[in-house]
Amino acid sequence: MRKIILCSPRGFCAGVIRAIQTVEVALEKWGRPIYVKHEIVHNRHVVDKLREKGAIFIEDLQEVPRNSRVIFSAHGVPPSVREEAAERGLIAIDATCGLVTKVHSAVKMYAKKGYHIILIGKRKHVEIIGIRGEAPDQITVVENIAEVEALPFSAQDPLFYVTQTTLSMDDAADIVAALKARYPRIFTLPSSSICYATQNRQGALRNILPQVDFVYVIGDSQSSNSNRLREVAERRGVTARLVNHPDEVTEEILQYSGNIGITAGASTPEDVVQACLMKLQELIPDLSIEMDLFVEEDTVFQLPKEL
């Protein structure tokens, strides 16, 4: 019988849960409005629900009245934003994911030691902007192998590299291999900069790909890790669609006769996954459902001390 294979883990990671709870608890404790620098996570459903509860999402701290509370999103901010918040008398609450903070700390430490840092990631992504702000004169962002080949450093230069936490492990591995080929002495953190949740979700998806011929990645188009999941499937020759609403699950699926895989980005609520699953079952009523467990997750991050 044709079946749906549900990846596990999928959806919310510990950093996203912490960020969302930070906004919710702040609203309960201090009431509305609570200002949030950038979307707390990259998912429209999450942001809309928090906005209804009284969160105000802003990009410019000038929009925040003096002496108000402002939450920094899970993606992190550059030091200049923290400084501006302090100058304006804002009460800052940091919802930056701990794994992003780890990368910030490493960049600061190695920049102080005189290393030039190669930062692998999407240069316009808010996480990369935040990390780069730690040492802008000592950081070079690379997005692909061509940019590695264009780097001006010698093999003897002191170099350190880190990656955006939500990258495709496939792409990151290719870029790192190119870096090490040019700069054999370059090194990184003992553990990967790519976060556990990104690795687990990509691993869970890779695990089911030999069994399916179509994949739905439930996630927002702005979500880096959701887009990387789609690319993981496509790189292995499996058709994949990134959808964020049941209406985007269309009759296109009727063109495919094999099993269907479903996963979700780390900022995707489970109720959106279930709504998309129900729509799929309406289109193909005789589908059975199978859960494929890749690894159990038990990571929990504590809320900011202010809460």
From Swiss-Prot:
It is an enzyme of class 1 (oxidoreductase). Binds 1 [4Fe-4S] cluster per subunit. Its cofactor is [4Fe-4S] cluster. InterPro entries: LytB/IspH. It comes from the Bacteria. Pfam families: LYTB. One of its GO terms (molecular function) is 4-hydroxy-3-methylbut-2-enyl diphosphate reductase activity. Dimethylallyl diphosphate binds at H42, H75, H125, S223, S224, N225, S267. Isopentenyl diphosphate binds at H42, H75, H125, S223, S224, N225, S267. CDD domains: lytB_ispH. Its EC number is 1.17.7.4. It catalyses: isopentenyl diphosphate + 2 oxidized [2Fe-2S]-[ferredoxin] + H2O = (2E)-4-hydroxy-3-methylbut-2-enyl diphosphate + 2 reduced [2Fe-2S]-[ferredoxin] + 2 H(+); dimethylallyl diphosphate + 2 oxidized [2Fe-2S]-[ferredoxin] + H2O = (2E)-4-hydroxy-3-methylbut-2-enyl diphosphate + 2 reduced [2Fe-2S]-[ferredoxin] + 2 H(+). The active site is at E127 (proton donor). GO terms for biological process: dimethylallyl diphosphate biosynthetic process; isopentenyl diphosphate biosynthetic process, methylerythritol 4-phosphate pathway; terpenoid biosynthetic process. (2E)-4-hydroxy-3-methylbut-2-enyl diphosphate binds at H42, H75, H125, T165, S223, S224, N225, S267. The keyword Oxidoreductase applies. Keywords: 4Fe-4S, Iron, Iron-sulfur, Isoprene biosynthesis, Metal-binding, Oxidoreductase. [4Fe-4S] cluster binds at C13, C97, C195. Pathway: Isoprenoid biosynthesis; dimethylallyl diphosphate biosynthesis; dimethylallyl diphosphate from (2E)-4-hydroxy-3-methylbutenyl diphosphate: step 1/1; Isoprenoid biosynthesis; isopentenyl diphosphate biosynthesis via DXP pathway; isopentenyl diphosphate from 1-deoxy-D-xylulose 5-phosphate: step 6/6. The keyword ATP-binding does not apply. Catalyzes the conversion of 1-hydroxy-2-methyl-2-(E)-butenyl 4-diphosphate (HMBPP) into a mixture of isopentenyl diphosphate (IPP) and dimethylallyl diphosphate (DMAPP). Acts in the terminal step of the DOXP/MEP pathway for isoprenoid precursor biosynthesis. Belongs to the IspH family. NCBIfam families: ispH_lytB, PRK01045.1-4. This is 4-hydroxy-3-methylbut-2-enyl diphosphate reductase. It comes from Chlamydia trachomatis serovar A (strain ATCC VR-571B / DSM 19440 / HAR-13).
